[in-house]
């Protein structure tokens, strides 16, 4: 399913707090990049051809047009208020950094990160990823230029950490017809 995201404010960055009884999105893709931070939930994460369990603290960066979905564990479908999905999702336009990446050396590592994101990137838990997660929580309360700046800081941290792994071995792009 191709998801068309609405950036109603005209901003290239969108952040949302997710509070669901279980994940409800089918397998989908969109042109925007997406950072998903699972605060509370467990289940299976589907990214391209990769299927792996996810737990609380899971942090991934998904590239443009990379198919993905999350399937909650069965306990989340039993209407138990103790089992809820809480997550932060930060989405940004693939054109957001296009000029800066091509013209400023300060964005070289971010450019490499976004190229790697086409495979899906899982960030292993460590001090650096804790800092990224804290910045995502902070970003929930930001708007306008402050949100844009925080997004750049988050991507900068992601680009410098060594504690990450690609989720797919091959570049995965769905056929759009």
Regions found by a protein language model. Give the residues of each.
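A hydrophobic/aromatic-rich effector-binding and dimerization subdomain
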Residues: 2-7, 66-134
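Generic protein-terminus/edge-of-domain signal
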Residues: 1-61, 65-66, 73
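Juxtamembrane/interfacial segments around transmembrane helices
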Residues: 38, 112, 136-142
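Generic anion/oxyanion-binding catalytic loop in active/binding sites
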Residues: 24, 46, 99, 140-143
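Short, surface-exposed helix-loop/turn micro-motifs enriched in polar/charged residues
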Residues: 27, 52, 102, 143-146
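Short, Lys/Arg-enriched, Trp-marked, Pro/Gly-tolerant hinge/linker segments that flank
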Residues: 121-127, 140-177
């Amino acid at each position: 399913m191709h998801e068309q995201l609405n950036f109603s404010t005209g901003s290239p960055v969108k952040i949302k707090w997710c509070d669901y009884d279980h994940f409800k999105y089918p397998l989908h893709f969109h042109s925007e990049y997406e950072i998903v931070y699972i605060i509370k939930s467990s289940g299976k994460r589907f990214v391209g051809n990769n299927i792996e369990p996810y737990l609380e603290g899971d942090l991934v960066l998904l590239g443009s047009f990379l198919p993905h979905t999350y399937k909650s564990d069965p306990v989340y479908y039993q209407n138990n208020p103790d089992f809820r999905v809480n997550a932060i999702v930060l989405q940004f336009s693939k054109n957001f950094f296009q000029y800066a990446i091509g013209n400023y050396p300060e964005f070289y590592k971010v450019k490499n990160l976004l190229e790697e994101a086409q495979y899906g990137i899982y960030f292993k838990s460590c001090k650096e990823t804790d800092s990224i997660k804290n910045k995502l929580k902070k970003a929930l309360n930001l708007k306008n230029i402050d949100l844009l700046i925080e997004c750049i800081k988050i991507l900068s941290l992601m680009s410098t950490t060594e504690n990450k792994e690609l989720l797919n071995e091959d570049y995965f792009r769905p056929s759009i017809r």
